[in-house]
Design a protein with these regions (language model features):
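Glycine-aromatic micro-motifs
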Residues: 2-245
Length: 245
């Protein structure tokens, strides 16, 4: 069966299913499943023409300064994967991406590697969260995209482009905090509660963007992060000790 017939038949079988075009960290299958425990029915690699991969979604300056989105860019293209899912699963994905506080959903037309075209929804940074210029993402975040691109079989030339991107350097303590927090995010996602971690990151982002003195910002961060990191360490340890099936 060709990819064209497979895509067309899937649409005929369920008109309510939603196609999402993943191009950032959601390229990585384990992250996609762990972040929101998503169940994807079908997936196909493809490219989005006249758009670019942008790192212009404002994050937390000291932890994750930028996240990926797509922006119009004539002559450029973004490679990624088409994901077919139910409306319920798509709502879980939206919750895991900040509950509409970070991204808007744009309708795009993606060309699969087999040449067929499919309309899909992609995430683009809200104007209120968009930075005037792109900022390099962290290596942790960028590696999720790179590994996901390889696992999904994206074009070698595009993977080379991803490999050439610069990343934001974090210190050892920040790396540890980041590792624990994102482990916690995956744990909450696996139990169907991705919004808990999203709200934590929204609070940290609000503190980061506030006009508070730096000393007060760090006091607030420590107050919030201390119990969060203890919980993250417990969840991470439980996950590591869980018997392998």
């Amino acid at each position: 069966m060709t990819e064209t017939s497979k895509v067309d038949s899937s649409i005929d079988q369920n008109q309510e299913d939603i196609w999402n075009f993943a191009f950032g960290s959601n390229l990585h299958p384990e992250k996609l499943k762990g972040r929101a425990n998503l169940k994807v029915k079908e997936s196909f690699p493809g490219k989005l023409k006249d758009w670019r991969l942008a790192f212009n979604l404002r994050g937390i300056s000291w932890l994750e300064p930028s996240m990926a989105g797509v922006e119009p860019a004539p002559g450029d293209e973004v490679h990624g994967v088409l994901l077919r899912m139910s409306p319920e699963e798509f709502r879980k994905l939206v919750l895991s991406e900040g509950e509409n506080h970070a991204y808007r959903q744009v309708e795009v037309e993606v060309e699969t590697y087999q040449g067929t075209k499919q309309k899909a929804l992609a995430f683009s940074a809200l104007d209120s969260r968009k930075m005037p210029e792109d900022k390099p993402p962290t290596l942790r975040y960028l590696e999720l995209i790179r590994k996901g691109a390889r696992l999904r079989g994206l074009a070698p030339d595009y993977i080379s482009r991803l490999d050439s991107l610069e990343h934001f350097e974090k210190g050892p303590l920040t790396q540890l905090i980041s590792h624990l927090l994102f482990d916690m995010m995956m744990c909450f996602g696996s139990i169907g509660k991705p919004q808990i971690a999203s709200r934590l990151f929204r609070t940290l982002r609000w503190i980061d963007g506030s006009m508070f003195p730096r000393s007060l910002k760090w006091l607030l961060n420590i107050t919030i992060l201390t119990p969060a990191l203890i919980l993250a360490a417990i969840l991470s340890l439980r996950h590591q000790l869980r018997p392998k099936s």
